[in-house]
Amino acid sequence: VFMMDKGVWNGKRLLDENWFEEGMSAQIMQYAGQDLSEEEIAVLKQDEWNHGYGYQMWISSDGAPRLDGAGGQICVIYPEKNLVIAVHCHTNDTMGLLKSIRTRIASQF
């Protein structure tokens, strides 16, 4: 809720809204500084990990910021849908979990 409200908690602003705008968008690309062709970048972007990194948040291929932990801890934020999905489970397939979140839950909103 705090992240969806961009720094407001119980009606009081605790963090600047700009921090969330910046932090939930790509601040760095994983391939920055490399001399890559458009084709090479397109191949890299087939991987969920290569869509940018904000402030402790990965940017997913669909543009949704996400927080990842080890073994199935994931939180995906869809501000345009007013939706936050948090999962804590045991899996070695974080990208499969992300795909399920996207196709089975987020797509319903």
Specify the residue positions occupied by each region the protein language model found.
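A short acidic/small-residue loop/turn micro-motif
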Residues: 91-93
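Active-site-proximal binding-pocket segments
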Residues: 1-25
